[in-house]
Swiss-Prot record:
Protein name in the entry: UPF0381 protein YiiS
GO terms under cellular component: cytosol
InterPro entries noted in UniProt: DUF406, UPF0234-like_C
Pfam families found in the cross-reference section: DUF406
Domain of life, per lineage: Bacteria
Organism, as annotated: Escherichia coli (strain K12)
NCBIfam families, sorted: DUF406 family protein, PRK09981.1
Family: Belongs to the UPF0381 family.
Length: 99
């Protein structure tokens, strides 16, 4: 990896972060199945806490979710809308801590 960085820096390569993060998509969707409704609700509480910790204190994240009872399992569908795409990316990376 160091060789790539050295070659890139000697040739003057650069990337505009606006090319990567353009704020077109600020919503993260999440879906998971659980054995019980209580497990789904408990996990949703953790997701809300994570979204609150990730989002800016002024605006916060907009959260919409549904918990559906299906035969033998419960489905959690959630959407988290952040004020900017960077917050959404940080939130999605933070989901790894809940795995």
């Amino acid at each position: 990896m160091k060789d790539v960085v050295d070659k890139c820096s000697t040739k003057g390569c650069a990337i505009d972060i606006g090319t990567v993060i353009d704020n077109d998509n600020c919503t993260s969707k999440f879906s998971r199945f659980f054995a019980t409704r209580e497990e789904a609700e408990s996990f949703m509480t953790k997701l809300k806490e994570l979204a609150a910790a990730t989002s800016s204190a002024d605006e916060g994240a907009s959260v919409a979710y549904k918990i559906k009872d299906l035969e033998g399992q419960v489905e959690l569908d959630a959407a988290f809308t952040f004020s900017c795409q960077a917050e959404m990316i940080i939130f999605e990376l933070s989901l790894r801590s809940l795995a």
